[in-house]
Curated annotation (Swiss-Prot):
Known catalytic reactions: 4-CDP-2-C-methyl-D-erythritol + ATP = 4-CDP-2-C-methyl-D-erythritol 2-phosphate + ADP + H(+)
Top class in the EC scheme: transferase
Domain of life, per lineage: Bacteria
Functional note: Catalyzes the phosphorylation of the position 2 hydroxy group of 4-diphosphocytidyl-2C-methyl-D-erythritol.
Organism phylogeny: Bacteria, Pseudomonadati, Pseudomonadota, Alphaproteobacteria, Caulobacterales
This protein's name: 4-diphosphocytidyl-2-C-methyl-D-erythritol kinase
Enzyme Commission number(s): 2.7.1.148
Protein's UniProt keywords contain Transferase: yes
GO molecular function annotations of the record: 4-(cytidine 5'-diphospho)-2-C-methyl-D-erythritol kinase activity; ATP binding
Gene: ispE
HAMAP family the UniProt entry points to: IspE
Length: 293
C-alpha cells in the first residue's frame, strides 16, 4: 500500500495582529489562500514505524517529534487508541523552512488525511480538525488547503470570500524568519493597530480590484518587524515592488517568503524568470493562489 497527498504552501494575503493576551497569545485576523506549489507526503505499509525527509530542503527537517508530521501521527494514534499498524511516512520537502508558508502545518495536515484513510476512514472531519488544531495555530486552517478567514489564535475559521483566480510569484531569500522572534520584535517595536478584519467586499471580479482592496484596507503587521530582524526580506519586497508585473508585493505570515500578485499567468511567468536571473541565490516559484489543489 502507498498513499500520497499534496501539502500546499499557505499564503496570508493579509495578517492583522493584536496585542498579546494574558497567556502571551496574539489574536489575529487573516485571509489565507493556498498555492499550487508545496510539499508531498506519502505513506507506506511497513514492519516498523519510521519517518524520513527527502527533497530540496529535506536535510533541514527534523525527523523526530520536533517535526509536525511525526507529532500528527502520534496525536492521531492517541486519538484512535488501541493497537494500530505501523507505517513509513516520507516527506518530500520542496518548501523552505521557517518561511511563512505554513509548510509544517500543511505537511501535518497531509499526513493526517493519509493516516485517516489508512487507519480510520470513518473518523469525522470534525474529529480530524480537532487533532490538527492541537498541533498549532495554523493546524486546522492547513488541514484541507482551502481558502479561509482565520480569527482568534487562528482556530476560528470561516469560508473566504469569493475571489478571482490569483496569479503570484513567491520569493524567499533563503534566510529563516522564526515566528517567535518576529512576534517578540513586533511586541517591542509597535503599538498594535488591532486584529480587526477589514471590510469584506463582495463582488471583487478582477485581480486589480483585489489588489486595490488589499492595498487600501489590509496589511501584514509582522512585515515591518521581520524586515527589521532580517533586512534581506526588505530587499525582496523592494525588488518585487519595482517590477512592472507586480500589482501588490507583501510578505506572507512571519516571513521570510514574500509574494507578488500579477495580472495573469504570463506576467507571473515573466516576473519569476527575471527574478531567478537576477537572484539565482533566492527561491522563486510562480504559482496560482486559491485551493484546494
Amino acid at each position: 500500500m502507498r498513499l500520497d497527498a499534496f501539502a500546499p504552501a499557505k499564503v496570508n494575503l493579509f495578517l492583522h495582529v493584536g496585542g498579546p493576551d494574558a497567556a502571551g497569545y496574539h489574536p489575529i485576523s487573516s485571509l489565507m489562500l493556498f498555492a499550487d506549489v508545496g510539499d508531498r507526503v506519502s505513506l507506506q505499509a511497513a514492519d516498523a514505524p519510521s519517518f524520513e525527509a527527502t527533497g530540496w530542503f529535506g536535510a533541514e527537517v527534523p525527523v523526530d517529534d520536533g517535526n509536525l508530521v511525526v507529532r500528527a501521527e502520534m496525536a492521531l494514534r492517541a486519538r484512535l487508541g488501541g493497537p494500530t499498524p505501523p507505517f513509513r511516512l516520507i516527506l518530500d520537502k520542496a518548501l523552505p523552512i521557517a518561511a511563512g508558508l505554513g509548510g509544517g502545518s500543511s505537511d501535518a495536515g497531509a499526513a493526517l488525511r493519509l493516516l485517516r484513510e489508512a487507519l480510520a476512514p470513518d473518523l469525522s472531519d470534525a474529529d480530524l480538525e480537532a487533532v490538527a488544531g492541537g498541533l498549532g495555530a495554523d493546524g486546522a486552517a492547513c488541514l484541507w488547503g482551502a481558502p479561509v478567514m482565520a480569527r482568534g489564535r487562528g482556530e476560528r475559521l470561516s469560508p473566504a470570500p469569493a475571489l478571482p483566480a490569483l496569479h503570484a510569484v513567491l520569493v524567499n531569500p533563503l534566510v529563516p524568519s522564526p515566528t517567535g522572534a518576529v512576534y517578540r520584535a513586533y511586541d517591542a517595536a509597535v503599538a498594535p493597530e488591532g486584529e480587526a478584519p477589514p471590510p469584506m467586499l463582495d463582488g471583487l471580479e478582477s485581480i486589480e480590484e483585489v489588489c486595490a482592496w488589499l492595498a487600501g484596507f489590509t496589511r501584514n503587521d509582522l512585515q515591518a518587524p521581520a524586515v527589521a530582524l532580517e533586512p534581506r526580506i526588505g530587499q525582496v519586497l523592494d525588488l518585487l515592488a519595482d517590477e512592472p508585473e507586480t500589482l501588490l508585493a507583501r510578505m506572507s505570515g512571519s516571513g521570510a517568503t514574500c509574494f507578488a500578485l500579477c495580472a495573469g499567468d504570463i506576467e507571473a511567468e515573466g516576473l519569476a524568470e527575471r527574478i531567478e536571473q537576477m537572484r539565482p541565490d533566492w527561491w522563486v516559484k510562480r504559482c496560482r493562489l486559491g485551493g484546494p489543489f
